[in-house]
Swiss-Prot record:
The gene is ruvA. CDD domains: UBA_RuvA_C. It comes from the Bacteria. This is Holliday junction branch migration complex subunit RuvA. Homotetramer. Forms an RuvA(8)-RuvB(12)-Holliday junction (HJ) complex. HJ DNA is sandwiched between 2 RuvA tetramers; dsDNA enters through RuvA and exits via RuvB. An RuvB hexamer assembles on each DNA strand where it exits the tetramer. Each RuvB hexamer is contacted by two RuvA subunits (via domain III) on 2 adjacent RuvB subunits; this complex drives branch migration. In the full resolvosome a probable DNA-RuvA(4)-RuvB(12)-RuvC(2) complex forms which resolves the HJ. Pfam families: HHH_5, RuvA_C, RuvA_N. Residues 1-64 are annotated as: Domain I. Its main location: cytoplasm.
């Protein structure tokens, strides 16, 4: 299994890159539009990869952001969600927006992704509602510590996640104080 590739980008399309390694081997990787926006032809880069081996193909999907990779891997495990649909979701939603949509049961967010209808949106939410979501790891450490502290005080994760992005503090203790004012 190939988990990461380092090389120089020799070809770049909106959702696909070719990386040439130091050994001279070139690999084609499908990438999200978010990842594509951060890459340039000729740039040396290391991409984390997810490899999917099918009867007719051996496909590589590349990620700069490990949370985006986790989101992709979580999605491809769901019934009726293939790699193309999962990559479309990764191209439309950040890991944080994805987590918030699942936590809040926001089917409209998923329906805004090309190729996702109401049934698929509801299925994603239903199947992932109990999963450990990405938002815990996609926020800075002090925000995650504040989230855990507020949960320990008995507040619901859904309410905390909704207000957390609006808070301005940059330390755990200040963030908890600010959150308590909003949650009370």
């Amino acid at each position: 299994m190939i988990r990461a590739i380092e090389g120089i980008i020799t070809k770049k399309e909106p959702a696909f890159v070719v990386l040439k390694t130091a050994g001279g081997v070139s690999y084609g990787l499908f990438i999200s539009l978010f990842c594509s926006a951060k890459l340039s032809k000729g740039e040396k880069v290391e991409l984390n990869t997810t490899q999917i081996i099918r009867e007719d193909a051996n496909l590589l999907y590349g990620f700069l952001d490990t949370n985006e990779q986790k989101m992709f891997e979580m999605l491809i495990k769901l019934n009726g969600i293939g790699a193309s649909t999962a990559m479309a979701i990764c191209s439309s939603l950040s890991p944080n927006a994805f987590s918030n949509a699942v936590i809040n049961g926001d089917a409209d967010t998923f329906k805004s992704v090309p190729g996702i209808g109401p049934k698929t949106a509801r299925r994603i939410i239903a199947e992932l509602s109990d999963a450990k979501l990405i938002s815990d790891e996609s926020v800075p450490g002090y925000q995650n510590e504040a989230l855990l502290a507020l949960e320990a005080l008995g507040f619901k994760r859904e309410k905390i996640v909704k207000i957390l992005p609006d808070l301005k503090s940059t330390s755990t203790s200040e963030l908890v104080k600010e959150a308590l004012k909003k949650l009370a």
